[in-house]
From Swiss-Prot:
Name the UniProt record assigns to this protein: Glial cell line-derived neurotrophic factor
Complex and partners: Homodimer; disulfide-linked. Interacts with GFRA1 coreceptor and RET: forms a 2:2:2 ternary complex composed of GDNF ligand, GFRA1 and RET receptor. Interacts (via propeptide) with SORL1 (via N-terminal ectodomain); this interaction affects GDNF-regulated, but not constitutive secretion. Also interacts with SORL1 in complex with GFRA1; this interaction leads to GDNF endocytosis and lysosomal degradation.
Region forming the signal peptide: 1-19
CC annotations in GO: extracellular region; extracellular space; Golgi apparatus; receptor complex
The keyword Transmembrane helix appears for this protein: no
MF-aspect GO terms: glial cell-derived neurotrophic factor receptor binding; growth factor activity; protein homodimerization activity; receptor ligand activity; receptor tyrosine kinase binding
Length: 211
């Protein structure tokens, strides 16, 4: 039963208790006629009874009010109790229904990371590790280009690839787009272990592109 329905029932009970008819044996006592000679006014009429008036009407009214208040409090608490009474198995099933969506989202993010395009990657090295024949303790951040250029292929690249597979072209090898530097870092200056000054130009990538 909804809250408003219960309130309506309570109001009907309250109205019934307040409008309860007088018990049998009750009648109005008519006031005596006005005595003009003495100048007295009419005496207000009062209730009289052949039997004693029951004393339980105030108690009945209090019982109705207590019932209304208890019903309203019970209805206010009922939504919280229903939520608390939700079986643990139902809550676990709802959590399990939400978890596959999260796992699928993580899988898609992982696939995007694997299939990334041409990007710039950095690694910390010693100049000697470059394999250029320098003996030095100088260090640098070497940046290089890595990744696939399939997403950057144009219609021209696709046509060349198809013609090369069908052997419609000459024996010349057709080049494909590669992930290459399109800009380089500033020159690197350093001293080797023999105190000889060296300069490395275009040694590290700054920006990458498919060319």
């Amino acid at each position: 039963m909804k809250l408003w329905d219960v309130v309506a029932v309570c109001l009907v009970l309250l109205h019934t208790a307040s409008a309860f008819p007088l018990p049998a044996g009750k009648r109005l006592l008519e006031a005596p006629a006005e005595d003009h000679s003495l100048g007295h006014r009419r005496v207000p009429f009062a209730l009289t009874s052949d039997s004693n008036m029951p004393e339980d009407y105030p108690d009945q009214f209090d019982d109705v009010m207590d019932f209304i208040q208890a019903t309203i409090k019970r209805l206010k608490r009922s939504p919280d109790k229903q939520a608390a009474a939700l079986p643990r198995r139902e809550r676990n099933r709802q959590a399990a229904a939400a978890s596959p969506e999260n796992s699928r989202g993580k899988g898609r993010r992982g696939q995007r990371g694997k299939n990334r395009g041409c990007v710039l990657t950095a690694i910390h090295l010693n100049v000697t590790d470059l394999g250029l024949g320098y003996e030095t303790k100088e260090e640098l951040i070497f940046r290089y280009c890595s990744g696939s250029c399939e997403a950057a292929e144009t219609m021209y690249d696709k046509i060349l690839k198809n013609l090369s597979r069908s052997r419609r072209l000459t024996s010349d090898k057709v080049g494909q787009a590669c992930c290459r530097p399109v800009a380089f870092d500033d020159d690197l200056s350093f001293l080797d272990d023999s105190l000889v000054y060296h300069i490395l130009r275009k040694h590290s990538a700054k920006r990458c592109g498919c060319i």
